């Protein structure tokens, strides 16, 4: 007998050699029916996995993240089975689960139409109704290659596996797929499925490879859950910054300008200007000094920093080292430039910390499949900065940086929407990271200790660090459920030495400083996208590009409307007047669609009494009030940065 420690701490004795599913059956038939996978000794395992020793075990149902992934992973195989039934000539690529669903990539002659997606969905339902058993089996490499000989992408995946790796397959009826799992015991629990869309995707995410057809879908154990999800998806589409931002005239794109290069229109530029002025003033108040550095540098600079070795593929390089005496690259970051400023003068320990800040235009050569609206672009604006400090100052400076980020998030009204991720290196990925295990271990321990001292609730993620050190990532989910990093705070253990940076300590000795890479608001474009989605375009008054719109009832009141505009502008309010010869109801509706915080209607009565008739986004129609009172009210709201 072996002892199984369950999630609630209770211990159950079972025979050795039982599968996770059989252990679930011994606990409860209901639990077994709803089981999707298990977490055995901290690792997600298939329900068929055999347990031979004392272990901790959690049975995962659809209510857990792990259970949902196994559930949707199985649904992706059902989709692949349906494709092979209806389009047997199509070739299989990969079909993982993702947050809120799954996708599968196929090599097909043409992308799937809406009609074909409907047919595939119906075929999936037929397969589920047939309820074939799901079987798992393993094969030696030569037999696996023979089984998959007609599936070139599967053959490539098998050949990519290291020698000695387990090669496993899952079978649903007569459909067999190469897969590591985990999967459900049967397809019957999939009661509701929906194929959402088809897009293009490069094999292995590399645009040098063939473009495949990717089908996205989602699945649930209850139809009511699917209906609720689809309803939420429709709401998300309404908030999608890529759609709403264009409708509101915040940004646009042009194919002749290029992908990943959005054009900020006057409204979008005004929003970013507002945020930038606020951030620069706040950073100055907190002791930062401003720098202004070039948009490009010689390759020599990036070779010193290590970016040339670890990040060259993500850079825009100007020139050819084999032909040109000097090769330049557009900067993907600001750090080496600010290090050059630091090195231009000698520093005593009394001069530290030095806090550099810069509103930096940066360039990154993102692949076409990665780019999306304002969230992932090739040119962006970052509230960048670097703190050079002594080891004794590191914790306080890190704490102050986190404090600034929290202040910014609270002021923007999104403090409750963010999560913290401690991103660490992967010691097996020496191409991506500086290979100094001792320094990595030491720096990661320092950061973990600081985060614990600050009582920050964080998760840990391997292989997500910067190449020169660990980082704290502030994460935000977009309307589609995808998690994006909006701000990072990094501890750098390597670049001070590479750039020969030092300070003179109290004994007159040269010492290496610590460096904190940080941002206060992140990439302005990404933050703008996040705010559009958070507020469904109805940005807080202090951020809104147009804070008030004045609507005269007719041309007779144009002069008074202009007088109202002038007074508001004099007090720093962003205001416009709508003098078009349209009916007032039409102009009010249009101003509402533009998410204007305040609509001010002026006619004969308002002109005579020096009033404005106020319609606010928050309270609706408020009636007439003295112009002076309204001006004071909106100025105070803007000054307080109310959300």
From Swiss-Prot:
Q: Which GO terms describe its cellular component?
A: cytoplasm
Q: Which cofactor does it need?
A: Zn(2+)
Q: Does the keyword Cell inner membrane apply?
A: no
The alphabetical list of record keywords is: Aminoacyl-tRNA synthetase, ATP-binding, Cytoplasm, Ligase, Metal-binding, Nucleotide-binding, Protein biosynthesis, RNA-binding, tRNA-binding, Zinc
- Coarse class of the primary localization is cytoplasm
| Root EC class | ligase
Q: Which InterPro entries match?
A: aa-tRNA-synt_IIb (IPR002314), aa-tRNA-synth_II (IPR006195), aa-tRNA-synth_II/BPL/LPL (IPR045864), Anticodon-bd (IPR004154), Anticodon-bd_dom_sf (IPR036621), Beta-grasp_dom_sf (IPR012675), TGS (IPR004095), TGS-like (IPR012676)
Annotated residues for binding of Zn(2+) = 335, 386, 517
Ranges for region Catalytic: 240-540
The residues covered by the TGS domain are 1-61
An example molecular function term from Gene Ontology annotations: ATP binding
What Gene3D superfamilies does the database record attribute to this sequence?
A: 3.10.20.30, Anticodon-binding domain (3.40.50.800), Bira Bifunctional Protein, Domain 2 (3.30.930.10), Threonyl-trna Synthetase, Chain A, domain 2 (3.30.980.10)
- Catalytic activity entry: tRNA(Thr) + L-threonine + ATP = L-threonyl-tRNA(Thr) + AMP + diphosphate + H(+)
Give the intrachain disulfide bonds: none
Q: Tell me which Pfam families the record gives.
A: HGTP_anticodon (PF03129), TGS (PF02824), tRNA-synt_2b (PF00587), tRNA_SAD (PF07973)
Kindly state what the record says about how the cofactor is bound.
Binds 1 zinc ion per subunit.
Function, in words? Catalyzes the attachment of threonine to tRNA(Thr) in a two-step reaction: L-threonine is first activated by ATP to form Thr-AMP and then transferred to the acceptor end of tRNA(Thr). Also edits incorrectly charged L-seryl-tRNA(Thr).
Supply the HAMAP family for this chain: Thr_tRNA_synth
Self-association state and partner proteins as the record states? Homodimer.
The protein here is known as: Threonine--tRNA ligase
Species for this entry: Clostridium perfringens (strain SM101 / Type A)
Q: Which gene encodes it?
A: thrS
């Amino acid at each position: 007998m072996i002892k199984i420690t369950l999630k609630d701490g209770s211990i159950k004795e079972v025979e050795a050699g039982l599968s996770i599913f059989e252990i679930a059956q011994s606990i409860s038939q209901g639990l077994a029916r709803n089981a999707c996978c298990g977490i055995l000794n901290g690792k997600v395992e298939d329900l068929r996995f055999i347990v031979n020793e004392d272990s901790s075990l959690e049975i995962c149902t659809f209510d857990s993240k792990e259970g949902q992934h196994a559930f949707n992973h199985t649904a992706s195989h059902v989709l692949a089975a349906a494709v092979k039934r209806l389009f047997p000539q199509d070739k299989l690529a990969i079909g993982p689960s993702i947050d809120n669903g799954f996708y599968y990539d196929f090599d097909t002659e043409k992308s799937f139409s809406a009609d074909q997606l409907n047919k595939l969905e119906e075929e999936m339902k037929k397969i589920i109704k047939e309820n074939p058993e799901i079987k798992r089996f393993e094969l030696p490499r030569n037999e696996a290659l023979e089984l998959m000989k007609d599936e070139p992408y599967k053959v490539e995946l098998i050949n990519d596996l290291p020698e000695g790796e387990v090669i496993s397959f899952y079978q649903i009826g007569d459909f067999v797929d190469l897969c590591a799992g985990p999967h459900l015991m049967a397809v019957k629990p999939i009661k509701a499925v929906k194929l959402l869309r088809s897009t293009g995707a490069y094999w292995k995410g590399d645009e040098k490879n063939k473009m495949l057809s990717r089908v996205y879908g989602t699945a649930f154990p209850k139809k009511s859950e699917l209906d609720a999800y689809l309803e939420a998806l429709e709401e998300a589409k309404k908030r999608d910054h890529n759609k709403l931002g264009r409708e509101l005239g915040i940004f646009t794109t042009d194919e002749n300008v290029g992908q990943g290069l959005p054009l900020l229109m006057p409204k979008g530029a005004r929003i970013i200007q507002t945020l930038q002025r606020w951030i620069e003033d706040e950073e100055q108040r907190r002791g930062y000094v401003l720098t202004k550095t070039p948009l490009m540098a010689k390759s020599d600079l990036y070779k010193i920093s290590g970016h040339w070795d670890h990040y060259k593929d993500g850079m825009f390089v100007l020139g050819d080292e084999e032909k040109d005496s000097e090769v330049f690259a557009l900067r993907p970051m600001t750090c080496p430039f600010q290090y050059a400023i630091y090195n231009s003068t000698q520093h005593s320990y009394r001069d530290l910390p030095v806090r550099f800040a810069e509103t930096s235009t940066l360039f990154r050569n993102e692949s076409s499949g990665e780019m999306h609206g304002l969230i992932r672009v090739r040119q962006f604006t970052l509230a960048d900065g670097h703190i050079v400090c002594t080891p004794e100052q590191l914790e306080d400076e890190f704490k102050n940086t986190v404090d600034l980020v929290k202040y910014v998030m609270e002021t923007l009204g999104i403090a409750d929407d963010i999560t913290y991720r401690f991103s660490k290196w992967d010691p097996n990925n020496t191409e991506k990271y500086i290979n100094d295990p001792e320094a990595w271990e030491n720096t990661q321990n320092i950061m973990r200790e600081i985060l614990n001292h600050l009582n920050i609730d964080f998760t840990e993620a391997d292989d997500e660090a910067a190449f020169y050190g660990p980082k704290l990532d502030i994460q935000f989910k977009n309307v589609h459920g995808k998690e994006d990093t909006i701000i990072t705070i990094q501890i750098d253990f390597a670049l001070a030495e590479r750039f020969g940076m030092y300070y003179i300590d109290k004994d007159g000795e040269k010492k290496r400083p610590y460096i904190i890479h940080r941002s206060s608001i992140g990439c302005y474009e990404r933050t703008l996208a996040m705010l559009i989605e958070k507020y469904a375009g109805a940005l807080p008054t202090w951020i809104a590009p147009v804070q008030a719109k004045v609507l005269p009832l007719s041309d007779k009141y144009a002069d008074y409307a202009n007088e109202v505009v002038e007074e508001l502008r004099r007090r720093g309010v962003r205001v416009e007047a709508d003098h078009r010869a349209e009916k007032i109801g039409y102009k009010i509706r249009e101003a509402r669609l533009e998410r204007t915080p305040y609509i001010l209607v002026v006619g004969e009565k308002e002109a005579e009494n020096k009033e404005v008739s106020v319609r606010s986004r928050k309270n609706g129609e408020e009636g007439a009030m003295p112009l002076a009172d309204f001006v004071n009210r909106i100025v105070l709201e803007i000054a307080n940065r109310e959300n």
